[in-house]
């Protein structure tokens, strides 16, 4: 029996979502590699690059700038939650946040140092922070990034800014955020 289009779409999403139950320290690199291989060609949130291109571009730019390994790895893995989230991937039609930063951090925290996990967990907060503290930053955001910002709570309040500034990894998180923003170059 042929599947209906809707049933086929549900089936595809189920087989595309990675199985994280059996991930361990011996297979985490293969697990991440398989995500890039299987899903890296997916659209990146209304941008003109794929998800894989976006993540690799950020890491490549960090490496070319001679950043430390934790920044390079943070830039590479910051959006891994788009692939591991129970809620699926973001689209421009979304009306609710999908919390990909939390989904990614939940996987990474078992295998990577806290700084890597923090770069994933707080890169959305970093965008909200930069929008609240630097008006020029907001002006540079893409249409897709503004859309996701609105779903993610908009610019931080003054109270949120003060709380976020207490994070001991603030500088590195903000650095990864800037590579996140930069990694959207078609044909790089």
Regions found by a protein language model. Give the residues of each.
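Single conserved hydrophobic/aromatic residue that forms the stacking wall/gate
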Residues: 1-14
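Metal-dependent phosphohydrolase cores
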Residues: 15-188
């Amino acid at each position: 029996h042929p599947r209906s289009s809707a049933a086929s779409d549900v089936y595809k999403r189920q087989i595309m979502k990675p199985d994280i139950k059996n991930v361990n320290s011996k297979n985490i690199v293969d697990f991440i590699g398989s995500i890039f291989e299987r899903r890296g060609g997916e659209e990146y949130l209304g941008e003109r690059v794929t998800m894989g291109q976006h993540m690799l571009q950020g890491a490549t730019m960090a490496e070319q700038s001679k950043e430390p390994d934790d920044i390079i790895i943070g830039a590479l893995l910051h959006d891994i939650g788009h692939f591991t989230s129970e809620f699926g991937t973001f689209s421009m039609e979304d009306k609710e946040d999908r919390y990909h930063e939390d989904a990614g951090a939940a996987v990474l925290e078992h295998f990577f140092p806290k700084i890597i996990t923090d770069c994933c967990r707080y890169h959305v907060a970093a965008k909200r922070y930069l929008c609240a503290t630097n008006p020029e930053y907001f002006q540079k955001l893409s249409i897709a990034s503004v859309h996701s910002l609105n779903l993610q709570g908009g610019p931080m309040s003054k109270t949120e800014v003060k709380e976020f500034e207490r994070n001991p990894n603030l500088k590195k998180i903000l650095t990864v955020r800037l590579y996140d923003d930069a990694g959207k170059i078609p044909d790089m």
